[in-house]
């Protein structure tokens, strides 16, 4: 019985520390700050809804976790793209959080089957 209590306490402690560490590791994003930093992104991704090339992803309304993960993977080299890899190298953790918050805050444009925005 005592061993079971020790196991539960140890598990609770490990989980608490893991959640605390992840909260400290990921800064909170600020959409207003991200908007100020998004000028370079707009060169390819446009305003988030209208990209300069249809092969570039639209960023507006994407989940911030997805955007953050993608930028981290470009920065680490896990995702391969020469342009994004180079851009991501210049980003701090706070930049990534801010940009993720900004693009997630934008309303995505939905198109009907004929391609017209609704």
Residue ranges, per PLM feature:
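Bacterial N-terminal signal peptides that target proteins for export
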Residues: 2-12
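N-terminal signal peptide c-region/cleavage motif recognized by signal peptidases
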Residues: 20-23
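Flexible coil segments in periplasmic/lumen-exposed cytochrome c-class electron-transfer proteins
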Residues: 26-38, 47, 79-118
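His/Cys-centered metal/cofactor-coordination and adjacent catalytic loops
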Residues: 27, 54, 59
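Sequence context surrounding c-type heme c attachment/ligation sites in exported
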Residues: 31-42, 51, 60-69
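Amphipathic, hydrophobic secondary-structure cores in small proteins
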Residues: 57-62, 68-70, 75-86
């Amino acid at each position: 019985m005592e061993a079971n209590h020790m196991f539960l306490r140890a598990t609770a402690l490990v989980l608490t520390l893991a959640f605390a560490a992840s909260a400290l590791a990921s800064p909170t994003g600020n959409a207003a700050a991200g908007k100020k930093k998004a000028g370079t992104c707009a060169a390819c991704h446009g305003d988030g809804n209208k990209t300069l090339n249809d092969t570039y992803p639209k960023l507006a309304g994407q989940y911030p976790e997805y955007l953050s993960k993608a930028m981290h993977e470009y920065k680490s080299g896990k995702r391969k793209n020469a342009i994004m890899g180079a851009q991501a190298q210049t980003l701090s953790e706070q930049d990534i959080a801010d940009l993720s918050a900004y693009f997630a805050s934008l309303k995505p444009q939905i198109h009907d089957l004929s391609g017209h925005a609704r």
